[in-house]
Every structure is written in structure tokens, then in C-alpha cells.
């Protein structure tokens, strides 16, 4: 069993303008960490400010959730950038959220890239290094995917003096190498509440997941990513939170 209780993190602040995404006010009480969008894939200055204030109210740790500049594609499309450009877009977005946090007199605790930027970070050492370089400016941890080879990422991040937080996903199918099944493939995302609940508790209790072919894979995860996009999923997040709190 894990020695330390895992936390729950959730993507937040993804509305912008008149367009509403998620039910942050209903999910926030049940999570430990809020990954707040920074305006490129979603959010706007007003939404960022309101979401930071909401996290402060519930004493939830705030993380910056930078992505590619792609509102139409919700940041899920990979956009070619040089390593220098990757560092720049991360600096720009994290800096914006840090300023909002300072306005509300709360700290910014970590950075977790979004969508395609997150996936590209896990696949490309050059992109991972570029993100580490940007995050090092803020002196806070970077959240990445827990895999079967966490040490590889730890060694690189150590060069930049960036602590790492490792996360696992409650609602995603895993491949044998510890990476997520691409969303383009069948069964990549779990939709049945019991499947999501069981995987979350397996991660929290045993530090493992069952892969697509049924193999048990060990994952050293500090936190579990959950989603609260509809009433059913909000109830599920509450259920997972209450179960983990009893461990």
C-alpha cells in the first residue's frame, strides 16, 4: 500500500466568455488540487480570477494548466513549436496565473500541462526539457504522468532543479508501457462510474492499474486526476474523495 494518501486533482476554470465548461463550484469541495486553465486552450482573465478565488475558499492547492493556443481544438491538437517557443508559451501562461494568485493572496503550487502539450511532453525529451526550463523560473513542481519509468524524468528534471509530481488517471485506459491509450483508440476513456471508481481505488490502495490486456502495472503516483464535467461524474468524484479519506 502507498505510505502517503494520494490526492485528487481536477482540471478547472475551462469556461470562457459566455461559454461554460464544467461545474467547478460543485467539484472544488471534493478535490485537493485544481489545475486552472490559463487562457490558451480555455479560460479568460475573469474565469481565472473566479476560479482562483473558489480554490482559495475551499483551501485547494492551485496549479497552472498551460496548453497550446487552440481554443477551437480545446488544446487537444499538437501544434509544432521549437523548444524555445514551448518555454515561452509556458512562461506566459504560468506567469499570468501566478499574477492572479498574487492578487488573491494565495500561492501557485505547481504546473500541469494540458492535453496535447502534456502528451507531447511525455513523448519528447526536448519538449519536457523546455517545460522544465520554464517551470524552474517559478520554483514549483511540475506534474507529469506516472509511468513504469519515473526515474528517467526525475533525472532530467533534477538538472533544472524542478521537483516532479506524478499523477495517474482514474478514467483512462493504460497501455503495457504505462502510457495512456490514445483517445483515438476504442476504450481509451472509461465512462462507466464503477470502472472509474475501481481504478481510482486501486491506484490509491495498491499503486497499480490493470492495463488494456489485463496485466497489473505498478505506478508510483502522488495524485489521481478526476473529472467533474456532468452531474454523474461530480457524484463520482465525491464518492472517490470520501473513500480515499477513509484510508
From Swiss-Prot:
- Matching Gene3D superfamilies: Glycoside hydrolase/deacetylase (3.20.20.370)
Keyword annotations for this protein, in alphabetical order, are: ATP-binding, Hydrolase, Nucleotide-binding
Checking SUPFAM superfamilies in the record gives: Glycoside hydrolase/deacetylase
Key word Repressor present: no
Q: Which CDD domains match?
A: LamB_YcsF_like
Share an example GO biological-process annotation for this protein.
carbohydrate metabolic process
Q: Which reaction does it catalyse?
A: 5-oxo-L-proline + ATP + 2 H2O = L-glutamate + ADP + phosphate + H(+)
- Keyword Nucleotide-binding applies: yes
Q: What is its EC number?
A: 3.5.2.9
Q: From the UniProt record, which GO molecular function terms apply?
A: 5-oxoprolinase (ATP-hydrolyzing) activity; ATP binding
NCBIfam families per the UniProt record, alphabetical:
PRK05406.1-3, PRK05406.1-5
Q: Which family does it belong to?
A: Belongs to the LamB/PxpA family.
Purpose of the protein: Catalyzes the cleavage of 5-oxoproline to form L-glutamate coupled to the hydrolysis of ATP to ADP and inorganic phosphate.
Assembly: Forms a complex composed of PxpA, PxpB and PxpC.
The protein in question is named 5-oxoprolinase subunit A
Q: Which organism is it from?
A: Vibrio vulnificus (strain CMCP6)
Tell me what gene encodes this.
Answer: pxpA
